[in-house]
Amino acid sequence: RDLARFGEMMRRRGVGADGRQVVPGWWIDDINEHDSSAAWARGDFAELFPGASYRSKWYQIDRTEGVLCALGIHGQWIYIHPEAELVIVRLASEAIPLDPDHALSWRRGFDAIADAFL
């Protein structure tokens, strides 16, 4: 639950469930508004998440919809879709640190869930 709460705080620009500002909104804005898309396009994961970027440990996997993800080793995810008002957390222990096929399948599944909320 704590990862979901953290994701929700990120989705709400740093505001916690109790309405308190936990981290400055400008910090969340900085992650969303500044990117490394040119560097990303030349990197190892460009095929996995085309058009994505990375900043401050967060992956911006869909810049048009503001989808933000934290990806951890062995299949951990925090998926944030602001427009759908959705946060999804996936805890896992996949056999290898990063399985591109699994990551793409999970991303498609998360996107489908978000689409159902829109």
Regions found by a protein language model. Give the residues of each.
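A structural signal for well-ordered alpha-helical scaffolds and beta->alpha junctions
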Residues: 3, 24, 51, 106-110
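Active-site-proximal alpha-helical segments within enzyme catalytic domains
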Residues: 1-15, 76-77, 81-92
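A short acidic/small-residue loop/turn micro-motif
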Residues: 94-96
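Intrinsically disordered, low-complexity regions enriched in Ser/Pro/Gly/Gln/His and often acidic
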Residues: 20, 51, 98-100
